[in-house]
């Protein structure tokens, strides 16, 4: 069982997008830009995910990661349009890590950014999209080399390594290969809810 704040962060990093399971494949797997109506459906994934894990005792501490990871510092995020310190810190932290991962991950329609360019994007968006404190902390961890070393060690496509073990960013930078683990956990959650 996962215990403690670091464990909750690790599990939150893995499960934050679990609600996408409830999004129709025609939207979730679409390679072109989503229509406005489709985007409104996609924006429901934090609430869908929160409903999936609600009531499962050992997952209660990860609810803020799931529910608030799309809220932006300037209030233009979703699902509730919270801003600044209205957003639980788990959501503010995960947004920075998830954005870095998204920017540096190659997609079918674009190559991933060089990590240094992604760091610059975080810097430019702090105080707008991201909590300035967490951007600064992320950049400090980056400059110390622990994040870069871990990404090099894992080839960017593996589970976060021991190099991030003591960083608050540990396991919040999750590659898309973690989706398989997420789906396995989702199946267990659904089975537990049915019992």
Which residue ranges define each predicted feature?
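Metal-dependent catalytic cores of enzymes that make or break cyclic nucleotides
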Residues: 1-192
């Amino acid at each position: 069982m996962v215990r403690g704040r670091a464990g909750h962060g690790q599990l939150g990093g893995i499960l934050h997008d679990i609600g996408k399971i409830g999004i129709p494949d025609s939207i979730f797997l679409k390679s072109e830009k989503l229509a406005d109506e489709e985007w409104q459906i996609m924006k429901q994934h934090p609430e869908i995910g929160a409903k999936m894990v609600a009531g499962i005792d050992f997952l209660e501490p990860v609810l803020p990661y799931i529910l608030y990871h799309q809220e932006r510092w300037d209030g233009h995020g979703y699902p509730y349009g919270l801003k600044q310190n209205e957003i639980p810190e788990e959501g503010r932290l995960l947004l920075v890590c998830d954005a870095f991962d998204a920017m540096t991950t190659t997609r079918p329609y674009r190559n991933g950014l060089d990590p240094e360019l992604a760091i610059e994007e975080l810097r430019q968006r702090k105080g707008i999209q991201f909590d300035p404190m967490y951007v600064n902390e992320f950049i400090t961890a980056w400059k110390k080399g622990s994040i870069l070393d871990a990404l090099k060690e894992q080839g960017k496509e593996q589970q976060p390594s021991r190099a991030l073990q003591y960083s608050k960013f540990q396991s919040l930078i999750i590659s898309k290969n973690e989706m398989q683990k997420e789906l396995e956990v989702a199946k267990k959650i659904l089975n537990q809810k049915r019992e």
